[in-house]
Amino acid sequence: MLIAFQTIIHTLGNKMDWFKTQILNDKPVVFDPLRRQWVSLTPEEQVRQKMLHYLVGTRKVAAGLIAVEYSIKVNNLLKRADIVIFNNLGEPQMIVECKAETVPITEKVLDQAIRYYSGLKVKYLTLTNGKSMFCYKVEEGKIEALTEFPL
């Protein structure tokens, strides 16, 4: 069920030069403009920041409609979706699951996003490791792979 499409991933790129980074307590950190705080620059965070840059800079999603590390209750457990995008009415529209570039996007990653969907009904699921992106439309319990980014 995983169908990759090469989309605007070139804007995700390999460089972090458009991001504000520094060393804090001997560890690299990046300033997240959406959360308005410095966060540890892990490989997954690097992909998350690139995806946020793509969403706001290229896709023109309003920053105020994006939540980062959004808490979702799944089977009485509190989980965190990497990115949730809302519509203008405040309704969740998409869950984006980010993985480090070295982590392949597999059915296991899709299963994780589906679990998050069970706690937060959205129209779309997106999976990315910064090199590949997979998008799905979820409707009436059916998941359809898309060939382009839906927003």
PLM features: what roles do these ranges have?
Residues 2-124, 130-151:
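A short, conserved, highly charged catalytic patch centered on acidic carboxylates
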